[in-house]
Amino acid sequence: MNIQALLSEKVSQAMIAAGAPADCEPQVRQSAKVQFGDYQANGMMAVAKKLGMAPRQLAEQVLTHLDLSGIASKVEIAGPGFINIFLEPAFLAEQVQQALTSDRLGVSQPTRQTIVVDYSAPNVAKEMHVGHLRSTIIGDAAVRTLEFLGHHVIRANHVGDWGTQFGMLIAWLEKQQQENAGDMALADLEGFYRDAKKHYDEDEAFAERARNYVVKLQSGDTYFREMWRKLVDITMTQNQITYDRLNVTLTRDDVMGESLYNPMLPGIVADLKAKGLAVESEGATVVFLDEFKNKEGDPMGVIIQKKDGGYLYTTTDIACAKYRYETLHADRVLYYIDSRQHQHLMQAWTIVRKAGYVPDSVPLEHHMFGMMLGKDGKPFKTRAGGTVKLADLLDEALERARRLVAEKNPDMSADELEKLANAVGIGAVKYADLSKNRTTDYIFDWDNMLAFEGNTAPYMQYAYTRVLSVFRKADIDEQALASAPVIISEDREAQLAARLLQFEETLTVVAREGTPHVMCAYLYDVAGLFSGFYEHCPILSAENDAVRNSRLKLAQLTAKTLKLGLDTLGIETVERM
């Protein structure tokens, strides 16, 4: 149930009846303060201006046409023309009852779309580091949300699996007589990569051999393709362990690396030339874009093929967007890539649109994100100043969580303790990131993320177990509870019910904007409202069975909402803490 959408429709009809144009925006929003009701319609200002009348006068006319019987208990005009809507307790009770009868908690399904989500994108022959964390977990939260809403989601892990580095790696492996790459751990590959790069920079004969190997690899030579495949396999096997630890839904089947688009690049360049979009400039093939200016104020040149015939990331990204529309039949494409790549993507997509590869009706969206910083406000590094490996970060999270939960649960079995530490430790790392607006940088702080107070994973996981504890203490007749009516008579019951019923609205925002922090804020709010409700509205010691059962049902919907909401974020819940 999307109450905001229902009210928007009703207010819009009333505005049109009051003389507003058919495309008027009612601007119905969740109210920021209790005294302004549950929702507020703010659209009178803009429409009144167009009609040449006072906003309050328009609001008064709208009210004469607004029928919210059975939905609102009170509707009032505030200030210059805001319309405050207070929901009817009986309406809230009915919607809570309906939500409890559905596994989806009453969340409706939008028109199904095919949505491609590009996220994670590690590089072959390198271990994942903290720089991969944000794309991986924010992208996965978007995927989970879109799938829950009923969309057909295609995960696209745009792995860096092509380029000159493979000539270096294969040449170095061969030099070391270690062609049997399948037996190597990825940590070895990291060392091999460093050594290969050193030799490439210092030994011209080695560099020449590496360049020849790239040519052979690109021409499809069987031996070199096999060596390349081994490197990819080792990397993705290791990455899968990290994905599984992070409770991320990516699998090997989702890999759509740069190599996938390689065969398409000559055709792309030829087509852009034929369409008059690409021209020769100083030996390279370039697309000049009026939409982007260089320092001199001239159209910026975007190279799509170098003098030596090599292609660039832009060329690959053009082919990639074309493939996602033509072959994957995407209705929408989301890219979870850091903010530093924004101009690069905008240039590639401008070319894509000009060439007619993807129509304007199919959105290409850069859901960019900021950086993870250390407490000093600089990019997060090891003490020695090196890049933090993701596996090491997760190991430390687990170790810290182990100490934390062991302290609080001295009698818990070793198995239970390990499960709980894993849920808390990994959950803390993910939630600390997901709860921040993705567009900003954020400070990575162990103490904050593992705290049991505030908007953290441990607090949210504890809040969930606290609701469950009510049911453990109660001697509940499941059948009697299922058939019991919901009664909303106290303010705190109404506030909790109204917020619980905004779950669909929250999911809709996350799906549209790709902002999981909105879900985190919502769940934190629900947990806080339940805490106030629990304190002021006795459940197990309620004045009679009818009130007790009704409050148990509110607790039941709270538990289900917290669990489902955390699941869309990829955060595990636990039964005990």
Curated annotation (Swiss-Prot):
Record carries keyword Nucleotidyltransferase: no
Swiss-Prot/TrEMBL catalytic activity = tRNA(Arg) + L-arginine + ATP = L-arginyl-tRNA(Arg) + AMP + diphosphate
> According to its UniProt record, where is this protein mainly located?
cytoplasm
Q: Which UniProt keywords apply?
A: Aminoacyl-tRNA synthetase, ATP-binding, Cytoplasm, Ligase, Nucleotide-binding, Protein biosynthesis
User: Which PROSITE patterns does the entry mention?
Assistant: AA_TRNA_LIGASE_I
Which Pfam families does the protein's record reference?
Arg_tRNA_synt_N, DALR_1, tRNA-synt_1d
The protein's Enzyme Commission number: 6.1.1.19
A GO BP entry is:
arginyl-tRNA aminoacylation
Coiled coil regions, renumbered to chain = none
| Superkingdom as given in the UniProt entry | Bacteria
Q: Name one GO cellular component term.
A: cytoplasm
Q: Which GO terms describe its molecular function?
A: arginine-tRNA ligase activity; ATP binding
Where does motif 'HIGH' region map? 122-132
> Where is this chain's protein located in or outside the cell?
Cytoplasm
Membership in a protein family: Belongs to the class-I aminoacyl-tRNA synthetase family.
Subunit record text: Monomer.
- Protein known as: Arginine--tRNA ligase
Q: Which organism is it from?
A: Salmonella enteritidis PT4 (strain P125109)
